[in-house]
């Protein structure tokens, strides 16, 4: 790729931060808002689903989802997301980022609404249709990962590229927060309109029939922000790097970016030979890719896999951890609406105090500190705080020490988000060639979701008490919350070691990082 071909890409690399950058952040970021909202809102309503559809009047405890149903409801969207990341990642390189970007959003809108309209009033029918639609919701969400990251990286200038991609990803924190606020608002409204006694006072009346609408409204709300951004996604031009380096149309790329940057970019004559240079046409499964990027791909996949085991197991099962330490009262002392409110309040406080600030610390410092140092430090601090919670676990569960537990637990989330949860999303969008960028990001993200599935399914069983008398209905004894947290700490430490396989992209152009600029040096 000679210097002439780089004209339009250089213009993007050195462009001052301007309106189109922020427009791209909002368009891609609102997709991530929806992604996070849809994936995490289910953790707010699983206990409510148990009360409604698995009520047993003979039991001293409210109904709860059977183990296989809980695992399916929590994990099916993650399975869909993994599939979507691989499929749309590949498709984004084959057809272009823009062509498939709108399709992912349409899937999210339709499946969010359909999830809330899950058919029937019997447990089997509702759970089956809910899981079906949440799988396809996850499939659409999965496509948003590689496409949003790739589009933002290819639009950004090299000076603030990390902050722009991080800002898109930071909308995940806002989505988690929004899920909490929506649940708080909806449960408060229903509590005032349809007051009910606690389960201990009246088992049947503690779950009035109207609460069936609570979880449906919460789940369906995720469609709204996605719908608001669809028009603007369709108006975005294809990225210049895809048009020039993959579609081989430098003229169109120059015209598109001249409009976006609102400046004239000169079109050089010697372009075709550079763009079509055979040295840059190696495939994903070639020896050349293995030589250049094999360790990089191992680094991005392994770190994302290990991070998501810890991150998703903690996020999806916050309610179980908070119940175990007594931060959420025993279920029998609440009615169905109160339980939703208390779980949402706990999750919202964690998001507000640690999750959201962690994301925006990454936005603020990633282009000064660098991706590598932030990720390494994040894994290290997560390990420290996880062990600090786990080893003296019996100390933290005492009533007088619960605030300390919440502080320590919050700090693990802060350093996850001011750390590997953000950087594992950013780096794969920067270090691979344009024609494989979306695919490699999709592979890396899918490895992360594989870790999330391990966390979602594994933690559900592992965190059960070792005492058979204390396990949840239908579960075998596990290793307990304490030992589960120790295991997560060990995984965080291993993630820190694999970070050394990932290069530092700070301040470099995408072509310099991917090796696509090497041809120009050979030709000069």
Swiss-Prot record:
Description of what induces expression: In roots by phosphate starvation. Repressed by auxin, cytokinins, and the Pi analog phosphite (Phi).
Tissues in which the UniProt entry reports expression: Mostly expressed in roots, especially in trichoblasts and in emerging secondary roots and root hairs, but not in root tips. Also present in hydathodes, axillary buds and peripheral endosperm of germinating seeds.
A GO BP annotation: cellular response to phosphate starvation
Bilayer-crossing regions: 25-45, 71-91, 100-120, 132-152, 162-182, 212-232, 293-313, 349-369, 372-392, 403-423, 442-462, 485-505
Record GO cellular component, one term: plasma membrane
Activity regulation field: Inhibited by protonophores (e.g. 2,4-dinitrophenol and carbonylcyanide m-chlorophenylhydrazone), the plasma membrane H(+)-ATPase inhibitor diethylstilbestorol, and the phosphate analog arsenate.
Keywords attached to this entry: Cell membrane, Membrane, Phosphate transport, Symport, Transmembrane, Transmembrane helix, Transport, Ubl conjugation
Membrane-topology annotation of the record: Multi-pass membrane protein
Reported modifications of this chain: Ubiquitinated by NLA. Ubiquitination of PHT1-1 leads to its degradation by the proteasome.
One GO MF term: symporter activity
Signal peptide: none
Purpose: High-affinity transporter for external inorganic phosphate. Acts as a H(+):phosphate symporter in both low- and high-Pi conditions. Confers sensitivity to arsenate.
Entry's family note: Belongs to the major facilitator superfamily. Phosphate:H(+) symporter (TC 2.A.1.9) family.
Complex and partners: Interacts with NLA.
Protein name per UniProt: Inorganic phosphate transporter 1-1
Gene that this polypeptide is encoded by: PHT1-1
């Amino acid at each position: 790729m000679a210097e002439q071909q780089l004209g339009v890409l250089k213009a993007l690399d050195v462009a001052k931060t301007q309106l189109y950058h922020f427009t791209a952040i909002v368009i891609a970021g609102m997709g991530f808002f929806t992604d996070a909202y849809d994936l995490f809102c289910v953790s707010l309503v699983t206990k409510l689903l148990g009360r409604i559809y698995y009520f047993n009047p003979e039991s001293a405890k409210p109904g709860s989802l059977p183990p296989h149903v809980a695992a399916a409801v929590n994990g099916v969207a993650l399975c869909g997301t993994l599939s979507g990341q691989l499929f749309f990642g590949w498709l984004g390189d084959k057809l272009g980022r823009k062509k498939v970007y709108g399709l992912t959003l349409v899937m999210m809108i339709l499946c969010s609404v359909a999830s809330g309209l899950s058919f029937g009033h019997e447990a089997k029918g509702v759970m089956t249709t809910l899981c079906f639609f949440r799988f396809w919701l996850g499939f659409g969400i999965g496509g948003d990962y590689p496409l949003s990251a790739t589009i933002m990286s290819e639009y950004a200038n090299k000076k603030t590229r990390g902050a722009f991609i991080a800002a898109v990803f930071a909308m995940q924190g806002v989505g988690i927060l929004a899920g909490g606020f929506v649940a708080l608002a909806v449960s408060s409204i229903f509590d005032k309109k349809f007051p009910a006694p606690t389960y201990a006072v009246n088992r049947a009346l503690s779950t009035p029939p109207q609460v069936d609408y609570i979880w449906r409204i919460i789940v369906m709300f995720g469609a709204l922000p996605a719908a608001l951004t669809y028009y603007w996604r369709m108006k975005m031009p294809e990225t210049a790097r895809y048009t020039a380096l993959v579609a081989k149309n430098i003229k169109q790329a120059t015209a598109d970016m001249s409009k976006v940057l609102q400046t004239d970019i000169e079109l050089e004559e010697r372009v075709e030979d550079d763009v079509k240079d055979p040295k840059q046409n190696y495939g994903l499964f070639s020896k050349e890719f293995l030589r250049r990027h094999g360790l990089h791909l191992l680094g991005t996949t392994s770190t994302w896999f290990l991070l998501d085991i810890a991150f998703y197991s903690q996020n999806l099962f916050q309610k179980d951890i908070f119940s175990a330490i007594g931060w959420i009262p025993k279920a029998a002392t609440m009615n169905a609406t109160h339980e939703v409110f208390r779980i949402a309040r706990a999750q919202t406080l964690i998001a507000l105090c640690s999750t959201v600030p962690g994301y925006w610390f990454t936005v603020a410092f990633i282009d000064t500190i660098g991706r590598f140092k932030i990720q390494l430090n994040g894994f290290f601090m997560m390990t420290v705080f996880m062990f600090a919670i786990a080893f003296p676990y019996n100390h933290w569960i005492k009533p007088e020490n619960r605030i300390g537990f919440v502080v320590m637990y919050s700090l693990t989330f802060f350093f996850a988000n001011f750390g590997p949860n953000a950087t594992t999303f950013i780096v794969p969008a920067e270090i691979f060639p344009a024609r494989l960028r979306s695919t490699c990001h999709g592979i890396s993200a899918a490895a992360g979701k594989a870790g999330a599935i391990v966390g979602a399914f594994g933690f559900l069983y592992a965190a059960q008490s070792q005492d058979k008398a204390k396990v949840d209905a239908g579960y075998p004894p596990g290793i307990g919350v304490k030992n589960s947290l120790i295991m997560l700490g060990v995984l965080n430490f291993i993630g820190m070691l694999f970070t050394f396989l990932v290069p530092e992209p700070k301040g470099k152009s995408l072509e310099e990082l991917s090796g696509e600029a090497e041809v120009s040096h050979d030709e000069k």
